From Swiss-Prot:
Keywords carried by this UniProt record: Cell membrane, Lipid-binding, Membrane, Wnt signaling pathway
Gene expressing this chain: amer2
Recorded topology in the membrane: Peripheral membrane protein
Protein name: APC membrane recruitment protein 2
PANTHER family from the UniProt entry: APC MEMBRANE RECRUITMENT PROTEIN 2, APC MEMBRANE RECRUITMENT PROTEIN 2-RELATED
GO MF: beta-catenin binding; phosphatidylinositol-4,5-bisphosphate binding
């Protein structure tokens, strides 16, 4: 009313000129003309506040009326709904007995009461939300928190009520088709997604764990999908036979068949099997979380196991038996570990859940790797098999081939199997590839055990003859050297020496001096300075061959006495352990390169030397003659001459 009276006042205020800007505003708000426009603005603001208050009062009155009208109208509506539903149910079941006709009445009454309770709850929640927001002043955050707090028990109560309704109205499902449709909808709401992995009763525990583990592996291993499919189908066949734990197994079997299978199964299953999972899930939610956690742990463990067995990384392969295989060669250990992982996955996929539960348990990797390498060696051609016969030279050759310079303490059983797989990997025919060059010099100097087994070394030396590219079968009878091969090797040796070594150390083709240097490495440290210090006391072969340079026959006689001693002593101790110091590795690994440049081969000469000299008994006392010749310093020229003479004389001795 205030607004209307104020709006009727403007006609007496009209004596203003029509061109003024304030005329419309004063007509609206009915204020007299003042000296400035500022009071009019303030008056407009006050008027707006007053009109807003009045409108708010009227709106509040209207809101309270509508709210009260809703509350008063709902019971009559509910009564009408109740009457209609009861009448329809009576018409549906007119020919049924009295005991059955009372059931739809009860179901309709429970439905109407649930609807009424839902309305009451929503209205009270809205009123409480507005009052709490107005009183506490939390804003939207407080409103949402209060609504969430009341929403959780409401959902549980509603689902329980729906379960009761299904239990009461289950007897009528066969007669009425409309109620069957509603029942199908209700069963879909009975089992929400977070209840997928529920703890089943005791007789079904093992089946549930099997299904859960199979589902976990199904994502990681493609091999096991064939095993997983039939097992899940078997679980479904089991669910149709046993009534009580069947909904649980249907849930764990597969989510993709969940809706169809649940809607079809629940029509034939008694309703006593429907309600326990609901009560169990509401009463014990922590058990569900623990089951989910365990299932995720199973999937993690299976993925880790398959990943490690395929790629060869991780802690599962960190066994002392497999370290030798991994250190030996990348290809042999890679094939062994991958085949071991595949076999382990197939074994575990067949249903061994005990191996699946322990993450640190490797599925028989060493035996499988040794089997794989043995099969690889069995498939080798015939001309390569005599080269795989001796065992210890293979181990030392692998150390030189890897170039890591570490001593590998590996068990002998794994050495046999894993090192055989390396032989077919090394190239045999082309002389330019560096792999056989690195592997061969240590392969011919057999360790101490090969002194007891000379025939194997003979076979090794004979098998190495065609590798060098020159036929040496006729050079095994003893003969004295002639000067032309000495000159030829003296011409070939310096290019391999110059430009590669910075220090005045001996050339790489000086075999006996390098062996004495290896023996010295065992007695002292492995540093680079110790190499030059240890070389001086061990250089008698260079000095002796330098003194005897005038007569080649005399140098050959000396080499008969001097050359065996470093060969046998160093082959007894140093060929397997001289790789400790990585500083000596470049010099040792460059030895066969300079030897391969010359037409006469060192492989045949060294194999025959070690085979001829290992049974002799004159070699140990000749080692005592070595220390007196330590007075000549190291230089390049005598080393080259001694290297050339040692190679020529050792080859011509055969």
């Amino acid at each position: 009313m205030e607004v209307q009276t104020e709006c009727s006042e403007p006609p007496p205020c009209d004596p203003q000129p029509p061109g003024k800007l304030n005329k419309a505003a004063f007509k609206l708000f009915g204020k007299r003309k003042s000296g400035s426009s500022m009071p009019s603005i303030f008056s407009v603001r006050n008027k707006g506040e007053s009109t807003g208050k009045a409108a708010g009062k009227t709106l509040e009155l209207v809101r309270s009326k509508t709210h009260d009208g809703l509350i008063t109208d709902t019971p009559s509506e509910l009564d009408s709904h109740r009457k209609e539903e009861s009448a329809s149910s009576d018409q549906l079941h007119a020919g049924t007995p009295d005991g059955v006709s009372t059931a739809p009445l009860r179901s309709s009454i429970t439905k109407s009461f649930s609807f009424f309770s839902l309305l009451r709850r929503s209205s009270s929640r809205a009123g409480d939300g507005t009052t709490t927001v107005g009183r506490r002043g939390r804003g939207l955050k407080g409103l949402f928190s209060s609504m969430r707090w009341r929403r959780k028990p409401q959902i549980q109560e509603d689902t329980l009520e729906v379960a009761k309704e299904v239990k009461e109205g289950d007897l009528i499902l066969s007669s009425s088709s409309g109620s069957v449709k509603t029942e199908k909808d209700m069963t879909l709401t009975l089992e929400p997604l977070p209840q997928v992995f529920e703890e089943s009763p005791l007789p079904g525990d093992s089946d549930k764990w099997k299904v859960a583990s199979m589902q976990g592996i199904q994502g990681t291993n493609e091999v096991e999908c064939g095993n997983c499919g039939p097992s899940v189908s078997q679980q479904h066949t089991v669910t149709e036979e046993s009534p009580a734990p069947s909904p649980l197994r249907v849930q764990t079997g597969g989510l993709q068949n969940h809706k169809h299978s649940s809607s079809t199964h629940l029509s034939s299953i008694p309703t006593c099997a429907l309600t326990p999972p609901m009560e169990h899930s509401t009463a014990d939610p922590q058990s569900e979380q623990s089951v989910d956690r365990l299932c995720s742990m199973f999937t993690d463990v299976t993925s880790l196991k398959s990943f490690d067995s395929l790629t060869g990384c991780g802690d599962i392969i960190a066994d002392p038996e497999e370290d030798s295989g991994n250190g030996g060669s990348a290809t042999s250990s890679g094939t062994g570990s991958s085949s071991g992982g595949c076999m382990g996955r197939r074994l575990s996929g067949a249903g061994t859940n005990s191996e699946r539960c322990s993450p640190a348990k490797p599925p028989l990797p060493p035996q499988v790797s040794s089997l794989a390498s043995i099969h690889a060696s069995c498939y080798m051609p015939a001309h390569q098999r005599p080269r795989a016969a001796p065992k210890k030279p293979q181990g030392s050759g692998v150390v030189a081939y890897m170039g890591g310079g570490e001593e590998m303490a590996s068990p002998e059983g794994v050495d046999d199997a894993d090192m055989q797989g390396l032989w077919h990997m090394l190239p045999q025919k082309d002389e330019d590839s560096p792999a056989p060059r690195r592997a061969e010099p240590v392969l011919h100097h057999a360790p101490a055990r090969l002194e007891k087994r000379p025939p194997q070394v003979k076979a090794l030396g004979l098998s190495k003859i065609p590798v060098s590219g020159s036929s040496k079968t006729g050079k095994q009878q003893p003969s004295r050297p002639s000067p032309p091969p000495v000159d030829k090797e003296l011409q070939d040796a310096p290019p391999s020496d110059e430009g590669y070594w910075d220090s005045p150390t001996p050339g790489p083709e000086d075999e006996d001096s390098t062996f004495l240097r290896r023996d010295g490495l065992l007695r002292d440290s492995c540093s680079g300075d110790a190499l030059y210090d240890l070389y001086d006391p061990d250089s008698p072969s260079a000095a002796g061959s330098d003194d005897d340079a005038s007569s080649p026959t005399k140098s050959a006689g000396d080499l008969k006495m001097n050359l065996p001693s470093p060969k046998c002593s160093s082959s007894a101790t140093s060929s397997f352990r001289s790789m400790k110091g990585s500083t000596s590795l470049p010099r040792d690994s460059k030895i066969p390169i300079s030897v391969r440049q010359t037409p006469p081969s060192h492989s045949s000469s060294q194999g025959a030397l070690s085979s001829n000299l290992s049974p002799t008994s004159t070699t140990p006392p000749k080692k005592t003659d070595a220390p007196p010749r330590t007075k000549i310093p190291v230089s390049k020229v005598p080393v080259r001459r001694s290297g050339g003479k040692s190679t020529s004389t050792s080859q011509s001795r055969k």
